Amino acid sequence: GAPVCSPSRNVLMTGKHTGNCDVQDLKRVDAGENWRDLKGDWPIRTETYTLPEAMKKAGYATAVFGKWGIGDFGSTGAPDKHGVDRFYGYTDQKACHTYYPPYLWNDGKKEVLNTSLTAATIGHGSQPKGEVLADTYRAEQHSSDLIADKMLEFVKEKAHGKQPFFLYYAPLEPHVAMQPLQEWIDRYPREWDKSPYRGNRGYLPHPRPRAAYAGMISQMDHNVGRLLDTLKACGLDKNTIVIFTSDNGTTHDAGGV
């Protein structure tokens, strides 16, 4: 792996050492400032052979749900150019820094989700002085459960066919910004958090940073559990290999989490 996400995902999808990967840092195609129209990370090359391509060649249906991070649609690193039959989620690692993105990619089409909050940072020197409210940094549709729902639809569809499938589920959690649904925050004691996180180390402020971070992990755990339950309900649990791993290192130091 690598200490940051896009190079790690290049390693994961190709099996190469970081020194031999196309993506070795967080270099971008654009400046990364227009959150409503991010152009994507530096893409892998067309000739780079990926795990989905290998699985497709072996006769598997292939799908990716969540975070891709090695090429936007229209680039040489687009999922559909590297053996992915079904894609729903984020192609851009910077767009993944918010759980309320303006859109997600549904195969090669943009599915509009949110019209308000888009950026995952308030900018240096913009820390709120008064009360920090989680709702200030929320919008209409949270991406995590939407992605998980699409993933489960794929599993149920393929469960009735004869073709085996390869599924790469890449949830965003627990990457900051801290934006879990409130129901997951409320599961944890208020005394965990002595003070709010005001965004002074980057990303968005949050009134309960420790509970929020734990809530993101719980939300991810819940959706992984939904996947395992669906495999069992479809009679696939005894004939499916499940690998759980992470993409890179420790959390951003936001609010003492």
Features from the language model and the residues they span:
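Formylglycine-dependent sulfatase
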Residues: 1-257
